[in-house]
Each structure stands twice: as C-alpha cells, then as structure tokens.
Design a protein with these regions (language model features):
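A short helix-to-beta-strand connector/capping loop
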Residues: 73-86, 148-149, 190, 383, ...
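NAD(P)-dependent Rossmann-like dehydrogenase/reductase catalytic/cofactor-binding core
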Residues: 2-15, 41, 190-197, 209, ...
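Rossmann-like NAD(P)-binding element
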Residues: 51-52, 66-128, 135-136, 337, ...
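Conserved acidic E/D residue at the C-terminus of a beta-strand in Rossmann-like folds
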Residues: 45-50
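Glycine-rich Rossmann-fold phosphate-binding loop(s) that bind the pyrophosphate
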Residues: 25-26
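N-terminal Rossmann-fold NAD(P) dinucleotide-binding loop
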Residues: 29-30
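Rossmann-fold NAD(P)-binding glycine/threonine-rich loop
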Residues: 112-164, 169-183, 359-413
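Aromatic pocket-lining residues of Rossmann-like dinucleotide-binding sites
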Residues: 36
Length: 526
C-alpha cells in the first residue's frame, strides 16, 4: 500500500529568513502571508490587482496591532513581522523565493496557467505549493516541466486560527518536497498531516457523513433540526450541530462540495448528495448569508428550542441484564450508580456475546446497534424495548436521545424516561430510525476514516488529527472507534446496511480486517 504517511527521513524546514511568496491576497492568501511573516519569513504578496495586495498588507498590520493590544504579541515583534511583508509589482518579483504558495480561484486551468508562468520565473529549487481544497494536485502539476516540486499546502480558514495544514502529494510529488513543506508548516505553529491527492483529501472526504446522515435523519423525520443539533452538541460533544454548521458554511458551498466528491468517486453511494439540501439551494435558503437556512436569521427571529420530554417520576429500581462487558454501557452504568441506582457490574460468562442491557419496570434498554427499536423488540419478542444513543462522555453529557419500539407501552417508556432524567439527562425522543443520531454519525465517520487509511490516503494518526484540528471534532473518528470497540462498530454498520439494504453503509474492509485479526483487542491506536 503506497501512502504519504510520514516524513521518510528527518525533514528540513525552510530557514526562517528565507523568502516566501503568496499568490492571491484574499482571505486565504492574506492569512497565509500573516502566518509566514509571523514565523520570520520575508513575504512577498502578489495579486493581479496591486491595490488589493497593498490593502491586504495594511489589514494584516491592523491584525498585528490588535494582537499587541490584547497582549498576544509584543510591539517589537509586530513591527518586525509587518516589516517583512511587501507587495510584488509583477510576478517576476518572486524569482528568488524558496517557496511560492498559490491561493487563487478554485479553477484547474487558471491554476495550471499560473504555475506554468511561475516555472519560467523561479529557480529549479523553489517549491511550488497550491492551497487548493478540492482540485487534484496531480492534475494541477500534470503540464509542468518539473511536477515533482508541486505539492498541496491546504490551509483552513481563518488561517491564523486554524491549526491544520493538509500536505498533499500528487503522483509526481517528490517525498522530500512534501517533507520540507510538512516541517515548515510545523515550524509555523501548525499541525500538518500528510495526504495523498484524492478527492476531498482527508477532511472534505471524511466529513461528508456528518452532514449526510443528519440530512437523511431529517428527511426520515427522526427529529427536527434544532433537536438533532442539540443531540450532536450535548451528547456527541461537537461544537456545532450539522444544521447549524451547514447554515454557517452556506448550503450552496456545502452541497457543491458533496456533489463534487460524489462525482469524483464515480457515484459512490457513500457520498450521494441530499435531495433535501438541493431543494434548500433551489429555494435560495443558503443559510446565514441569505437570512434563512434550516434556521431563520432575521432580527426578530428566535431559534427554536430542541424537543425535550416532560419530567417523569424516578423509577424504583433498575437492574442489568446478562451480557458481555461493554465500555460504553459500563460508562452509563456508572452514571446511574452515581445517581443512586443500585446497578451491579455487567456479568459475562456463558452469555459473553449477548448485548448488555438495563431492565426497568418491564422495559429492556439497550445501546443502539444499528437496528431500530422495533426490529430489536421483534427479535427479542419483547415489545417494551427502548434504545439509547451514544454519547462522547456519559459522565458529562447533558442530553441523551431515546427511541422506543412501536409496541412499547407508555408505562414502560415513562419508566425509562424517569431513569435517564434522574441521572441528570435532558431526554430527546427521536422517531424509531435505525442507528439513532450520534452513533450513526460517528460510525459512518469512522467507516470513511478507515477507508481513507485502507486506500493509502493517510495514516490513522493523520486522519484523527485532521478531523480534530480541521473541523474541531471532539475526538478523532478512529480514536472513537477504539473507545467504542471495533467489534461494536462493525456490528452496528452491518445492521445499518441490513436495515437500509444500501451499499452506502457497507463496512470498510479495514474495519473487518481489524476485527478478524483480534476481535477483542483490535485498535487503531496503541
């Protein structure tokens, strides 16, 4: 398996005083220029509009001044950094640069034209980098005389604040070039990761299920956007729910990225765009920038409250059913014990392959395994079945999602409600859809992350760093898999695939391999 996983030797970053050029003075270009100047480089900023580059440098100077006011930068350092920035009157002014970073429009032919011109200007030792977020690095460099010196250097916006840099190698990129850019980004205070040039690189590929599963849950009427967002924040630990985030990004942008990844992977159902989101785009409901998306953003608009179940009495008792020890189940058991319920450790023994459960006033309560509660109840021949969703940290989560089987009695369901409420959870009931909310999203993120590793796009460590530093996930998807257990994730995805009958939910071969290698101790991280 060929992959760009880590430096092949001790990498050498660019010297602090070396000359760096940034082409394009928009938000990304000016941010890159600011970071490079702050790291000690002489920086030349070029834009086809000279005044735009000059204004960008003035704006960077204002940023430095504000950092001084806040005590985050000394006046001496700010003056020195600003003094290292200058405008290029012509592209020829970048001739002596050791690194040129392109941050212009996302258009393949425009980028190819720029790099072809740069090759006639810079030295043979100059590294050429593209900040593209979506275009193949291989394709950009295909017509260069020396494509081996072209590498992706994908920053995230806002550049000064976001820690991640994806260092993307095309088929022709020499490893030492990628290594140098990796080391340079690290010296600039970033968290770089190596990636192979494939559609979406790491983040824009692996993040697709975060949006896709939320949109599907909404289309299946599992819950409203405010409730789904609250579950993802307050149980899943994500900073923003998927609908809030899509409104912030803009549905035109988010839908376009999903569609481009879907097309680039030749219609792989994993990346199928949402008809619901396309309708949002068709309607012009693009999110915050148009004043309406899944939420309304007018001056008088109030964000709707998430659904929460009415308070129920505390049940008299709860017991654990027979089943294998399970870290997720045991974490919840500890919280219930902390709320004063007498619940013993989950027994194993002869029923080591049984799913652990709680018993409460006749109801059986399980963690979702990818089947609906109704499917589970039918298999158990026990109508009073209730499922609970995954949480990042059951000790600290403030909300939990529950789903009841269609035949579950009100009495049994209310007892389970009272149990979780007595433990301090706000409970949101969702419709009985397979896989629920957090578990479904996390499992699909983990599945895509495992496929990226299996296909040599990146390492397991890189994908977890990328998702935490690039999109602020509370935990890397493969680290989350380790905490849940590979066996549980594989079972969950297999059940989800069976419930829907779709290739979208097929299990990554790497997850199956991990499971087969050692069903108990299979892990992605030591």
């Amino acid at each position: 398996m060929t992959a760009y996983l880590a430096p092949s030797s001790t990498p050498t970053e660019l010297e602090a005083g070396s000359l760096v050029a940034v082409i394009g003075s928009g938000a990304m270009g000016s941010g890159i220029a600011q970071v490079a100047a702050s790291a000690g480089h002489q920086v030349i900023l070029f834009d086809t509009r000279f005044d735009a580059a000059a204004k960008a440098i003035a704006a960077i100077g204002n940023v430095f001044a504000r950092l001084v006011e806040k005590g985050r930068m000394t006046a001496l350092d700010a003056d020195a950094a600003k003094g290292r920035l200058r405008v290029a009157a012509a592209l020829a002014d970048v001739r002596d640069c050791a690194l040129v970073v392109e941050a212009i429009v996302e258009d393949l032919e425009v980028k190819r034209s720029l790099f072809a011109e740069l090759e006639t200007v810079v030295s043979d030792t100059c590294i050429l980098a593209t900040n593209t977020s979506s275009i193949s690095v291989t394709a950009i460099g295909a017509e260069l005389r020396r494509p081996q010196r072209l590498v992706g250097m994908h920053f995230f916006n806002p550049v000064p604040l976001m820690a991640l840099v994806e260092v993307v190698s095309g088929l022709a990129t020499e490893q030492h070039v990628a290594d140098t850019v990796f080391a340079t980004a690290a010296r600039w205070g970033k968290n770089p990761v190596h990636a192979k040039s494939t559609p979406g690189f790491i983040v824009n590929r692996v993040a697709r299920p975060f949006y896709a599963e939320a949109l599907r849950l909404l289309s299946e009427q599992a819950a409203d956007p405010a409730t789904l967002d609250a579950i993802m924040r307050e149980a899943g630990g994500f900073r923003m729910g998927p609908f809030e985030l899509m409104d912030l990004i803009g549905h035109d942008v988010n839908f376009s990225v999903t569609r481009s990844v879907h097309q680039a992977y030749f219609g792989d159902p994993r990346f199928t765009p949402s008809v619901l989101q396309q309708e949002m785009v068709n309607a012009g409901f693009l999110g915050r920038k148009t004043g309406r998306g899944f939420y309304r953003y007018g001056d008088d608009d109030v964000k709707p409250a998430p659904q929460a179940e009415a308070a129920q009495p505390r049940p008299d008792a709860v017991s654990t059913g027979p089943g294998a020890a399970d870290p997720v189940f045991d974490a919840l058991r500890q919280r219930l014990a902390g709320a004063g319920f007498s619940v013993g450790a989950t027994p194993g023994g002869a029923l080591e392959h049984a799913a652990p459960s709680f018993h409460c006033n006749g109801a059986q309560v399980f963690l979702t395994d990818g089947r609906s509660a109704t499917e589970r109840a039918n298999a158990l021949d026990h109508a009073d079945t209730v499922l609970f969703d995954l949480a990042l940290d059951y000790a600290g989560a403030t909300r939990i999602a529950l789903a009841r089987a269609d035949g579950c009695s009100d009495e049994a369901y209310k007892a389970v409600l009272g149990l979780f409420q007595a433990a301090g959870f706000t409970v949101s009931r969702i419709d009985d859809v397979p896989g629920m909310v957090v578990m479904r999203t996390v499992a699909m993120l983990a599945n895509e992350a495992a496929d990226a590793v299996n296909q040599g796009v990146c390492s397991a460590a890189a994908v977890d760093i990328a998702m935490q530093k690039g999109v602020n996930y509370p935990r890397g998807p493969l680290a989350w898999t380790d905490s849940i257990g590979v066996a549980q994730v594989v079972t969950f995805l297999s059940n989800l695939a069976s419930s829907y009958g779709e290739d979208r939910y097929r299990v990554s071969p790497l997850l199956r391999r991990k499971l087969a290698s050692n069903s108990v101790k299979a892990r992605f991280h030591a």
